């Protein structure tokens, strides 16, 4: 067999798998990770959101002058963690799946930011509990990494319509895209 035909056969063997990888893997990767950064309304700063659909995690970096914070929304475990830079503490809470936007909602909203089509805003209030979390590893790597080196506390979602019996100045106001506002209220013990 001439050398030319061997090269052609080898080339065919390489092309077929390359086409399969391109057809199946590339679209899957596109669906797995989505990121975007955009200016915040009414504030100086930006919010960067990264969606990892495969792991079920949304990471948020908000460098607003009014309320700088980082966050993780772990959809597989229904957990929300927020690192509040003004309080130098982390807060961990159970996410109510009915109240939070889905991963698909967030991914679609990231694509619509430039056009200004936003879903309605919802607000939730959480109260910080005095118990400090000792073992962050049990809540997964994204939350452990986010809250490393700062005290971390549990927070409980307030039922809608219940009045807060605490100082409103103790609340940190967070915004997630235009989906929802979160208020995390209460004194952080030891600070």
Swiss-Prot record:
GO terms for biological process: negative regulation of epithelial cell proliferation. The gene is Gkn3. Keywords: Disulfide bond, Glycoprotein, Secreted, Signal. Inhibits gastric epithelial cell proliferation. Residues 1-30 form the signal peptide. It comes from Mus musculus (Mouse). GO terms for cellular component: extracellular space. PANTHER family: GASTROKINE 1 (PTHR16483). Disulfide bonds join 90-147. Residues 63-155 form the BRICHOS domain. It holds the Pfam family BRICHOS. The keyword Signal applies. Belongs to the gastrokine family. Expressed in stomach. Present in mucus cells at the base of antral glands, and Brunner glands of the duodenum. Present at lower levels in the mucus neck cell region of the fundus (at protein level). This is Gastrokine-3. Coiled coil: none annotated. Glycans are attached at residue 33. PROSITE patterns: BRICHOS (PS50869). It is found in: Secreted. Its main location: secreted.
């Amino acid at each position: 067999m001439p050398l030319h035909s061997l090269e052609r056969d080898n080339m065919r063997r390489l092309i077929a798998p390359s086409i399969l990888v391109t057809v199946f893997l590339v679209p899957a990767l596109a669906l797995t990770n989505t990121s975007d950064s955009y200016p915040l309304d009414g504030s100086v700063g930006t919010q960067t959101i990264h969606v990892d659909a495969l792991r079920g995690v949304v990471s948020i970096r908000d460098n607003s002058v009014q309320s700088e914070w980082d966050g993780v929304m772990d959809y597989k475990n229904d957990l929300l963690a927020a690192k509040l830079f003004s309080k130098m503490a982390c807060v961990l809470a159970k996410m109510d799946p009915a109240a939070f936007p889905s991963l698909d909602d967030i991914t679609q909203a990231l694509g619509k930011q430039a056009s200004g089509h936003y879903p309605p805003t919802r607000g939730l209030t959480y109260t910080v509990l005095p118990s400090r979390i000792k073992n962050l590893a049990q809540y997964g790597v994204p939350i452990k990494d986010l809250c490393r080196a700062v005290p971390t506390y549990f927070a409980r979602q307030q039922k809608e319509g219940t009045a807060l019996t605490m100082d409103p100045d103790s609340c940190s106001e967070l915004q997630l895209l235009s989906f929802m506002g979160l208020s995390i209220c209460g004194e952080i013990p030891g600070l």
